[in-house]
C-alpha cells in the first residue's frame, strides 16, 4: 500500500497508539494495514521517534553531552549505535543535539575572535609580513659591497686605487655574497663590488697612465723650483766677491 507523504495528523497518532497497544510495537505491517496511506516503516519511525512513552524528553545534561561527544569520536555518525548508550533517547534526538552542541561551540569561538580580523584578515596580515621580509632580504642582497680595497675606508686614495685597478692590481668580481654581521673585518679583509659602470680598461689605461706620469713630472719640477724660490738674496756691500748674484739658501 502506498503511503501518503505528509505530516501525521493528531487523529492518526491516536489511532497508531491504539494499534500498538493492540498488536504490540513489532508487527508494523499489520498495523499499517489499519492506517490508510501509511507504511509499516512510517508507523515504526513515528512510534519510536515521537509517540513511545519511554522517550526521554528532558533536556540533555552536561554529563550526557560529554558522553555524546565521546561516543561520536568513536562511532562517527552512526546515530543508531550511539543512541544505545542513552536510554530513552532516540537516534534522531542524539543526532539533533550533537548538531546543537557544534553550533553553540561555533558561536563561542566567534565571540573570542577579535572583531574585524577574521580568517581573511589573518591571512592578509601574514602575507604582508611575509612580503616585508622578502623585500628586506632583497634589500640586504642589493647592498653587498663593492671594490677590493686593501686598506680602510678612511685612508682611501681614490686616484691611486683607480690607477691600480687599471694597471691590473685590482680586479672586479661578478659574484655577490650576502653580508654577515660581524663576519668581515674591514681592516684585514677586502670588500667586494659590482662593475656597474663596465669600464673599458683597454681603451683608458694608457691615457690614465700618461696623465699620471705627467702629473708626477710636474710635481718633480715644482719640487725643484721650491728651493730656489726660498733662497734669500745676498748683497756684497763690502765688495768681497761676486756673491751679489747668488742667493743664500
Swiss-Prot record:
Biological process according to GO: cell wall organization; negative regulation of secondary cell wall biogenesis; plant-type secondary cell wall biogenesis; positive regulation of secondary cell wall biogenesis; regulation of secondary cell wall biogenesis; response to abscisic acid; response to salt; response to water deprivation
Gene Ontology cellular-component annotations: nucleus
Xref: Pfam families: Myb_DNA-bind_6
SMART domains cross-referenced by the UniProt entry: SANT
Tissue: Expressed in stamen. Present in roots and siliques, and, at low levels, in leaves and flowers. Expressed in stems, especially in fibers and, at lower levels, in xylems.
Alphabetized InterPro entries for the sequence: Homeodomain-like_sf, Myb_dom, MYB_TF, SANT/Myb
Main location: nucleus
Induction: By abscisic acid. Accumulates in response to salt. Triggered by MYB46 and MYB83 in the regulation of secondary cell wall biosynthesis.
UniProt note: phenotype after gene disruption: Secondary cell wall (SCW) defects including severe reduction in SCW thickening in both interfascicular fibers and xylary fibers of inflorescence stems. Hyperlignified SCW in interfascicular fibers and xylary fibers.
Record domain HTH myb-type: where: 1-55, 56-106
The protein's name in its UniProt record: Transcription factor MYB52
Organism field: Arabidopsis thaliana (Mouse-ear cress)
